[in-house]
Amino acid sequence: MDSEASDIEAELSDSVSAGGEEYIDDDDYTEDIDDQIVTAKSSRRTARRSVPKGVRTSKRIRDKELSVEVDEDYDEEEDVLSPSKKRHLHTRSMDKRQVAATASEKSDIGDSKGNDGEIEDGILEEEESLEKELNRGGGKEVEKSEESYYAQNDVGQKGEEEQDGESGGYEDNEPSISKESDELVSVVNGNGNEEDDEVEATKENTTDSTRSTTTRSKMLLDLLEDGGSKKKLTDEEIQLRRAENARKRKNLSEKRLEEEKQDTINKLLKKRAGKSRSHLPNDDEKNDGSSSFVKPRRPYNSEGMTRILRRYEEDLFCTF
């Protein structure tokens, strides 16, 4: 066994010396590959962070920026690497190609998304321009028809007919809005050329909306003119109103004075009634059956009055 092992070692040494190549350890090779993978990931992250959000760049500019950043990262790492690891730099050149390929794929995806967004923006701008033109043309026709309608009908029937028209306008407006939304979805998805149908739907929607707004505004104007309009008064009418107001104020002041006088009289009478000597029965005494006799309301020392005092022994008659 020892002889066979020695023969194999001798053959390997001869092959190395003849070919001029050195033996590479597998452990060192795997470590170098791991380092290369880590550097490739870090370079991709830096390339992603370098591009600011919301800025659209072309495909060529992105490829240039990515290649420059990757080369700088690898140059810095090559200066730091030991001479034993510099043997396998050919693998890093392969990694650079892979990074560039992935970056180009991402840029293609971003460009495709940007193109889709530009197409959608163009469609929306065309629709807005069509709606503006239709609003300008349709508003004049609606105003003419409504003026003739108001001229024929009476003022009393305006409110009821306009309310009925508003309710019908809202009901007709809902299906037109749903049609327009379906047509917009089909245009964005690219399901066919339906520009004529779009124009018709926008015409219906604009006419309904303009009718509802004009009817509302005219109703409000009619109400304001009927209820809120003030009549212009002449100088004579103003003077008459001022005289009426002054007369009313005088009457009020006289009533207040009379009420105050009556209050003072009542207060004085109450004070004077409390000073009388005669015993005035209360309400409770009046209700009792025992208080049948009511004394006269006059003082005892009045002239011409006789008073009888009856005792057990004698009766006394007193005169004043």
Swiss-Prot record:
Its main location: nucleus. Keywords: Chromatin regulator, DNA damage, DNA repair, DNA-binding, Nucleus, Phosphoprotein, Transcription, Transcription regulation. Residues 1-232, 244-306 are annotated as: Disordered. One of its GO terms (molecular function) is DNA binding. The modification Phosphoserine is found at S67, S129. Residues 1-12, 22-35, 68-80, 117-130, 161-174 have a biased composition (Acidic residues). Residues 105-116, 131-147, 244-264 have a biased composition (Basic and acidic residues). InterPro entries: INO80B/Ies2, INO80B_C. GO terms for cellular component: Ino80 complex; nucleus. Residues 42-59, 268-278 have a biased composition (Basic residues). It is found in: Nucleus. Component of the chromatin-remodeling INO80 complex, at least composed of ARP4, ARP5, ARP8, RVB1, RVB2, TAF14, NHP10, IES1, IES3, IES4, IES6, ACT1, IES2, IES5 and INO80. Present with 1470 molecules/cell in log phase SD medium. Component of the INO80 complex which remodels chromatin by shifting nucleosomes and is involved in DNA repair. This is Ino eighty subunit 2. It comes from Saccharomyces cerevisiae (strain ATCC 204508 / S288c).
